[in-house]
Amino acid sequence: MKISKEEVKHIAMLSRLELNEEEIGVYQEQLSRILDYIEKLNEIDTTLVEPTSHVIELKNVFRDDNVKGSISRDEALKNAPDQTDKFFRVPKIIE
């Protein structure tokens, strides 16, 4: 599937990319090859393949939540450049 330069420019604009003419040509070729590959994938007969949500069976691999001790508030604030009433003080970034 051939992609046009206008389509590449549109994709670049949506991606907030500024491309020169050489780059547009490169992306035009690369995107065309990608779309050709996808077309080949669409030709594969998958009628005998059972639908799955994942290609490998996964189990819950999360660990249990366990409460563990941590450093104290004073220890955490020890190296803070600025603090107020046992809280970190950071520069204001929103007016």
UniProtKB/Swiss-Prot annotation:
Annotated signal sequence range: none
Catalytic activity: L-glutamyl-tRNA(Gln) + L-glutamine + ATP + H2O = L-glutaminyl-tRNA(Gln) + L-glutamate + ADP + phosphate + H(+); L-aspartyl-tRNA(Asn) + L-glutamine + ATP + H2O = L-asparaginyl-tRNA(Asn) + L-glutamate + ADP + phosphate + 2 H(+)
Gene3D superfamilies per record: Glu-tRNAGln amidotransferase C subunit, N-terminal domain
Disulfide cysteine pairs (residue numbers): none
Keywords, comma-separated and alphabetical: ATP-binding, Ligase, Nucleotide-binding, Protein biosynthesis
Gene Ontology molecular functions: asparaginyl-tRNA synthase (glutamine-hydrolyzing) activity; ATP binding; glutaminyl-tRNA synthase (glutamine-hydrolyzing) activity
EC assignment: 6.3.5.-
One Pfam entry name: GatC
GO biological process terms on file: glutaminyl-tRNAGln biosynthesis via transamidation; regulation of translational fidelity; translation
Top-level taxon of the source organism: Bacteria
Quaternary structure (record): Heterotrimer of A, B and C subunits.
Entry similarity comment: Belongs to the GatC family.
Function comment: Allows the formation of correctly charged Asn-tRNA(Asn) or Gln-tRNA(Gln) through the transamidation of misacylated Asp-tRNA(Asn) or Glu-tRNA(Gln) in organisms which lack either or both of asparaginyl-tRNA or glutaminyl-tRNA synthetases. The reaction takes place in the presence of glutamine and ATP through an activated phospho-Asp-tRNA(Asn) or phospho-Glu-tRNA(Gln).
The name this protein goes by in its record: Aspartyl/glutamyl-tRNA(Asn/Gln) amidotransferase subunit C
Protein source organism: Thermodesulfovibrio yellowstonii (strain ATCC 51303 / DSM 11347 / YP87)
Gene: gatC
